[in-house]
Amino acid sequence: MIQVSRWMTKQVLAVEVNDSIGIARRVMAKHRINQLPVVTGDKLIGIVTDRDIRDAYPTSMLIDRAKEIDRFAESYTVEEVMTFNVVSVQPDTPLVTAVRLLRRHRIGSLPVVKKGKLVGIITRSDVLDFILSGRSLKQVSHRKGQKRQSGRP
């Protein structure tokens, strides 16, 4: 069975709980990502998304007022806008289980934790990479417990 650890991103970008939403916004923009795990040290505390940040801005500010937006972003911490109850998985979680969680919760990523420590992240892009590799989640989940036939994986 294919485990999350085989396809997860191990070099995880994250923000600290006391970082400003401006820092989170810049990291997301620079790396073209939509969410960041929030940590204290290496312990997962929550997750912040581009939508969390966007929703924090007063509507009137979203009309091209860059200086005000920057000032506002520096005055709030990630902790004030993040999601605390994070759906996460462990490195040995079957990939098919992670895919089901992504779909069920309609989220773009799952932090991967081991003993509370953030060790990776599995994203929709990682799942697409798996699919493009030519393997099938159905084949992987149905083969559990079956022996290989004719030398085929």
Task: Give the role of each language-model region.
Residues 29-37, 56-58, 63:
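Short, charge-rich amphipathic segments
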Residues 13, 20, 45, 87, ...:
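Glycine-/small-residue-rich active-site loops that bind phosphorylated ligands and cofactors
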Residues 20, 42, 62, 71-77, ...:
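Non-transmembrane, interaction-prone segments in cytosolic or luminal domains
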Residues 1-11, 49-87, 99-103, 123-153:
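Tandem CBS (Bateman) regulatory domains
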Residues 15-32, 39-40, 79-80, 88-106, ...:
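The conserved cystathionine-beta-synthase
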Residues 28, 36-52, 102, 110-126:
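A glycine-centered beta-loop-beta connector
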